Regions:
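Structural signal for short hydrophobic segments within the conserved structured cores
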Residues: 189-193
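Glycine/aspartate-rich loop-and-adjacent alpha/beta segment that forms the canonical ThDP
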Residues: 211-239
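A short, conserved beta-to-alpha structural element at the edge of catalytic cores
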Residues: 153-173
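Cofactor-binding active-site loop characterized by glycine-rich and histidine/acidic residues
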Residues: 3-6, 11-153, 171-178, 182-187
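Active-site flanking residues adjacent to catalytic metal/cofactor-binding acidic residues
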Residues: 134, 161-162, 221
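Phosphate/diphosphate-binding loops
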Residues: 198-200, 204-212
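Short glycine/serine/threonine/alanine-rich loop segments
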Residues: 155, 188, 217
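Short gly/pro/ser/thr-enriched loop/turn and capping motifs at secondary-structure boundaries
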Residues: 49, 165-168, 227-229
Length: 239
């Protein structure tokens, strides 16, 4: 699907922003297979694979990229702003903005449960929220604010950093004093897994999701992965 989008962009059937995730397939598949369909995902702008795995048809994804009404967001969102009623609350184009939104979703989940507005029965797992962000967004202040709020209220929140080693064209070593993103919050437990290995992603994500779902509070998970293409289709020579 990403290769098709690549070709359609070069043929000028797709305009504007387009961020492909070639190389990060194991991370996407492992995540979706490790969580419940009732869990809420707030993703960044590199999210075509997540949209597909959350139930969107290839036709609706490519339609969205082409700005057609058959697209998943009626053609108005484009590459960076997918949405699905199946607990996929975007794609967000503003770097890091999805993390406080996911934290707010986690707060709502806990508030409703604590006040018996929506309480899981014996056969129903507790829901969690997943806030996905990249290494380029990891230095955003709003993410640290979200860390604090999530731990202060012990929210059912999984912070998920997809570290593909480059924020646009800048390597993490040239932008971060400490590139161990899973250790960024000393009061939230963290784990790094090999994002290129499906089994590693499955084991690590299931462990993290079970921790959050058990009511112990937030967890910080890092996928150490790599994208095979440039930051976006606007990167010359990297397509």
């Amino acid at each position: 699907m990403e290769d098709k989008a690549n070709g359609m962009y070069k043929a000028r059937n797709i305009r504007g922003f387009c961020h492909l995730s070639n190389g990060q397939e194991a991370a996407n598949v492992g995540l979706i297979d490790s969580i419940s369909s009732r869990d809420v995902i707030c993703d960044s702008y590199r999210m075509h694979g997540i949209a597909f795995l959350r139930g969107k048809y290839v036709r609706s994804i490519l339609g969205e990229l082409c700005g057609r009404s058959s697209g998943s967001s009626r053609g108005k969102g484009g590459s960076m702003n997918f949405y699905s009623k199946d607990n996929l609350y975007g794609g967000y184009g503003i770097v890091g903005s999805q993390v406080p939104i996911a934290t707010g979703v986690a707060f709502a989940m806990k508030y409703r449960e604590d006040n018996h507005i929506s309480y899981p029965d014996a056969n129903d797992e507790r829901r969690i929220a997943i806030g996905m962000y990249g290494d380029g967004a990891a230095n955003q202040g709003q993410i640290y604010e979200s860390f604090n709020m999530a731990k202060f209220w012990n929210l059912p929140m999984l912070f998920l950093c997809e570290n593909n080693l480059y924020g646009m064209g800048t390597s993490v070593e040239r932008a971060s004093a400490d590139a161990r993103f899973y250790m960024r919050c000393h009061y939230i437990p963290g784990l790094r897994v090999n994002g290129q290995d499906l089994v590693s992603v499955l084991c690590g994500t299931r462990f993290a999701a079970d921790y959050v779902r058990s009511g112990q509070g937030p967890f910080l998970l890092e996928y150490y992965t790599y994208r095979f293409l440039g930051h976006s289709m606007s990167d010359p020579g990297l397509r």
